[in-house]
Amino acid sequence: MMNQNARRVIRVVPVITADAYADNDVLFNNTEIPLAVGKSGECSKLVSAMIISKSTQVFDGELFFCQTTQSVGAANSARNISDADFAAAKVLGRLTLDGSADDYTYGGGKIFRFDVNLEGAGATDGDVIAKQRFPILLQAATGTTSVFCFMLLSGTDVTPNMSVGDLELVLGVEY
């Protein structure tokens, strides 16, 4: 039986291409997150997430978590996801990344974090509201302990030029 207080840090390297990307491209297609839940078909809580990049390229995007391994298109191609494909992916949650605001530069790379989402409270008052991003519930399909993720580029910083293997997702889960 899985300890109800068990935690795990999962590292995943998504498949990306070594070409320049454009706005609304698929940064990476469905990527397996192994051991995302403690037992087959169960649920866990995603409590932290970051992307470590070996590149100093900045990018904005949307990171989706899904129950199934549904393709959403080829990496570095324009997003063109049908309603049926999106529904078949069984999306569990989404994180948005503002790469120029949510990054930390180290040596020759960057760390992009998803810890808090800051948004203006109103068009004229100038207040900023911090919206909590976690937890996100991750529900595995029957017969597996994996869930899946994909990322789409969207925003203002959307033309990164990276190398294969430049990105690593670091995900914290509680079972």
State where each predicted segment sits.
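Surface-exposed, low-hydrophobicity beta-strand/loop segments enriched in small/polar/acidic residues
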Residues: 1-175
